Amino acid sequence: MAKSTGPIRAAGVVLLREDSGQPLVCVLHRPRQNDWSLPKGKLDPGENEIIAARRETIEETGSDVVLGVPLATQRYKVENRPKSVHYWVGTERPGGPGFTPNKEIDELRWLPVAAAIDMLSYPRDGDLIREAIGQPTTTPFIILRHTEAMRRADFRGPVDAERPLTADGAQHAVRLVDVLDAFDIRKVYSSD
């Protein structure tokens, strides 16, 4: 298989939990790079950054995650290719499979903020932790426009809300479920 030469797209999370009212940060050891990093990974083809951030966090840490506010996007070069990593603040959600050491991640530690920043191999990751800790606690509020539906001119029904989705619209609606779940959305309000 030919090696890709285009931009690298990735997503990650500053994963937090509390212990006695103090925040702890999840840091990971990657044996191949011999470094300490935050949960992150490359997007699968056609994958949304939000879905990738959650998927990579679960895969690498064994913790399910609820995403919060977006953080700064890191941009740097890897083997002369531009890489961008989109980050979110994340908190643990009960029900993850639990951490199992593997060839990609062989150690996971939950550390106080200062110790986590000191442990990380890259200063830019420490900057993300400082940014994450500085964010207010929020509840996501997501505003969406409907996905692609049949043209109004072609629809003969009495109520526009019954206008069927196109094939693309149906695929978008299915993918939207995972996006909303990543933010732990529990209520949906709709207009006519």
Predicted regions and their residues:
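N-terminal strand-loop-strand
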Residues: A2-L38, F141-T147, R151
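A generic fold-level signal
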Residues: G6-I8, S20, N80-K83, K103, ...
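Generic beta-strand structural signal
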Residues: A11-G12, H86, D106-E107, T139-F141
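Conserved Nudix-box catalytic region and its N-terminal flanking loop in Nudix hydrolases
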Residues: G21-D64, A153-Q171
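Unchanged
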Residues: G41-A132
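Phosphate/pyrophosphate-recognition segments in soluble nucleotide-handling domains
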Residues: L111-V159
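Active-site-proximal alpha-helix that buttresses catalytic centers in soluble enzyme cores
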Residues: T138-D192
